[in-house]
Amino acid sequence: MSAAECPALKPRPGAHKMPAMETDTIIIGNGPSAMILSFILHGHLPYYSMNRPHPDPLLHAKLKDNPELLDADVTGLTEHFHASRLSYSTQALPVNVLLDTLVRPSVDVDVGEGETRVEWRYVPEKAVPHLVFGNAPKAGGQWNDNLVFASWDIQTLSYASMLCLPGYSFAEHYRKVNGKDLPAFTRPTRREIMDYFSAYPEAVGIDDSFQNNETLSGITRTANGFFISSHNIHCRHLVLASGIFSHVLQPLPMLQPLRFLQPTPEIPLLVIGSGFSAADIIISAPENQKVLHIFKWDPEGHPSPLRSCHQRAYPEYAGVYRLMKRAALAAAPATHKRPGKPKRTTSSPFLESRAWDEVYEGLPNAQVIAVEIQSESAVVTFQLPDGNTIERTVRGLVYATGRRGSLGYLDKPLLSEVLGCPEGTEPSPIISGKTLRAKALEDLEVAKDVFIIGSLTGDSLIRFAYGSCVQTAGRLIRAHTGDDKSGCRTPSSSRPQSSYLRVMNGMEGHEIYHNSDDCHQLEKIDSEAKETPPTSLDGLWSWMMRFWKS
């Protein structure tokens, strides 16, 4: 991506006139993982707490005589996890699973506020000078974004205890803001979590390191570290925490004009997507708004992530999945429908909240083959799986098929080094959760003095961010204090590099995008992912704002 395509990549005006700065570490991104790492680098070190033994007696036995977690032997501590009676994730990096079970023991079977087995000791002499840069206006990173215009009052998939950062929990923030205790089993709204994250740096005293609403660019390797040309800063270490959710996948050119049409209840809003982002739009829409939903349906090969949502825990997402399933069954050829006893059907408050048969139409696996703009609406022609074509009149489009991240702030040689591109190949800055996964399995230091944390490791849930942050902090602290052992590289995984761990995409389950042709999509996005002018979606934005304020 060039500076002409994306103004954010242009050097900061007057950067050459700024006084040169030096610091040990630059963290790129101001989201949850950056905040966890900054908290540690300010001198708050994690130790295993023996006030109450961990539910896993073997893990407790391994840690009781060596409680310091910065230098934890991940391989030795996690090698028994696969045979444990406790529930340990087999998908996340072992270091992330280790810290998750210590911070939130047995959280998968008890989502209450269980007692943490991690105590944070303040050791100021271990602090590492660092700065945190993020282009989000407030701390929280992409949690400040609403790129598909869903309601801010949509609940997160994770419970509050799974979204907490060290030193200041969401429960403490809730009590401070509302003057009462947080109810058990709370799924906060996205607005509440955004407010919590923005308040976090000041609450724990790390706001002195945060430079929000700043975009870095032109980062190059030097003889002694790195130079950030956009801000005239030198540093010894880089930590990439920019995530994999900054760029929304763009619709085909023929669909682009639909985004400028303002929806009206009488004419369907076209929603394209099979996951949580598409569901958020359907849930957020006014009750009388008609919706035409285009989605992939392959329950045996690549099922929608909505399928895993239990009706009691996530009634709204389970309800949208039920609508999709009904549409898929209705569209299936008669020869594919299995005869049998009718199943007992259940309903839910969400499914009874509006006349779905009147406002929702789902077209599974339909393809757009033509678009004709007609004044304030458009006629879209779809090809169905059986080869037949149909036409529908629509107003407005939400294209919610996923997001990607970008490492465009690195210059090409450094980008190639980070990605491990063969010599002579052109590196693409657009990345997914799979891009650096193989490197993360081997080491979080993906290039000399360059580390990745958070969703760049392939584990995007906040609960799994602690591990990469603790391990990276240990390396940075040892290097700064002179205790670093030359050539010592701590693996983030106890498994062979050839082991396959499924990437856990999704910002707390949102914006999940499943595509088997990942490399092709990355190439396509690289040429299409541009900054969208704030006024380009006025129609849809004003429609959503009018609804939320009503």
Roles of regions detected by a PLM:
Residues 2-136, 142, 183-550:
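Flavin (primarily FAD) cofactor-binding/catalytic cores of flavoenzymes
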Residues 142-183:
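Flavin (FAD/FMN) cofactor-binding and adjacent substrate-gating region
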